Amino acid sequence: GTSTVALIAVIISSILYLLFGGSGHKNLPPGPKPWPIVGNLLQLGEKPHAQFAELAQTYGDIFTLKMGTETVVVASTSSAASEILKTHDRILSARYVFQSFRVKGHVENSIVWSDCTETWKNLRKVCRTELFTQKMIESQAHVREKKCEEMVEYLMKKQGEEVKIVEVIFGTLVNIFGNLIFSQNIFELGDPNSGSSEFKEYLWRMLELGNSTNPADYFPMLGKFDLFGQRKEVAECLKGIYAIWGAMLQERKLAKKVDGYKSKNDFVDVCLDSGLNDYQINALLMELFGAGTETSASTIEWAMTELTKNPKITAKIRSEIQTVVGERSVKESDFPNLPYLEATVKETLRLHPPTPLLLPRRALETCTILNYTIPKDCQIMVNAWGIGRDPKTWTDPLTFSPERFLNSSVDFRGNDFSLIPFGAGRRICPGLPIANQFIALLVATFVQNLDWCLPNGMSVDHLIVEEKFGLTLQKEPPLFIVPKSRV
């Protein structure tokens, strides 16, 4: 039919473009020689972040790949990252949006995927001046601490049993966000029929779709066809997620119209008071839940993995907490007095940044970086994973050693380009202030309250520490532990 003819025309156009077109820029950064049609696609394996780090050893700070018809520039050192995220931040601030996520009504209202439009600036402002202020974060600390206590109670009931720890962490984080956003739990820990399992299925399916290969990302002419139905599936996931909290939003809107309504001082009240429309609220909540839960759960699972492998480090954190906190439960207000805990979080984020290549940027116009030409609409990736393991910056980069951050001013708040797990510049993760709090809180809660071992008497020497690449960097296989009380 007509669509088949159109598809053939697109494929022929792509081939002609690749053979006789190209970027037209002679001064691109160097890179491996591309093959006809597919470019460098077939040269990449399952762990591109690790391959990019190896390519940087050959080609230097920045290099070029041809991914189908797309020109991609990869930055692999802190100096190159500084050029992209600081010096040329404005010109390189646009987003490359994966074809699967180009859902009408979502991208243009998204903090993550939209370009730096007025809507985007307004949403960032709400995050910066309302949601993630120091005052707001401190006022809600008791919520996060209470959810951590509930997590410990749940794990106490699981003593001697095998527990997939990332599911417990994920559930706890969803409830933390549920209370910060809606002032209520989204589900009950350990109940497979509660709201979270449905929510989690939608969320993880979206992440899988984001992590899966879509030929249209490399041959954009195919984008309009949605050949594998990925965009349609993302739209269905979004619809399902919005339905889960749609009723809660409507209920709140009605409640706010009643005289004498007492503000709950949660994110929904802030969003409604800020005049955001339903599309903007849905997109913002989706990204707070999506980015906030999955990336943080993955980071905390990596921290638990490293602590399982390094019991001496666990003992040092425990000793520090005991000295500073004593017998009461650790609180977020204790963190300034727990430097070794803070160093452990930094070291986890150095070795295991939640988004290994950050999120792809796009050049708004042609510019020059490190004497190379970066053409307009070129896709730009920053290898945060490779930068965190760069032997020119870090001594023994593959060793997990929190000590390297003691008496060090290096931080991950976007000023030190050797440590950028949350990005930097105008597109730095807006939730960084709160993510830092609950990563540290969950790690401290585990260490203070629990002992744990691996299932079936497995030695830590046999613990597999492999990565599953995607938008987020997950541990493969997931960490299973057997918890036991320290009390």
From Swiss-Prot:
Lineage: Eukaryota, Viridiplantae, Streptophyta, Embryophyta, Tracheophyta
Its job: 3'-hydroxylation of (S)-N-methylcoclaurine.
Organism: Eschscholzia californica
InterPro entries per the UniProt record, alphabetical: Cyt_P450, Cyt_P450_CS, Cyt_P450_E_grp-I, Cyt_P450_sf
Organism superkingdom: Eukaryota
Membrane topology summary: Single-pass membrane protein
Gene Ontology biological process terms, A to Z: isoquinoline alkaloid biosynthetic process
Pathway(s) per entry: Alkaloid biosynthesis; (S)-reticuline biosynthesis; (S)-reticuline from (S)-norcoclaurine: step 3/4
Protein name according to UniProt: (S)-N-methylcoclaurine 3'-hydroxylase isozyme 1
PROSITE patterns: CYTOCHROME_P450
Pfam families: p450
Gene: CYP80B1
EC class: oxidoreductase
Cofactor section: heme
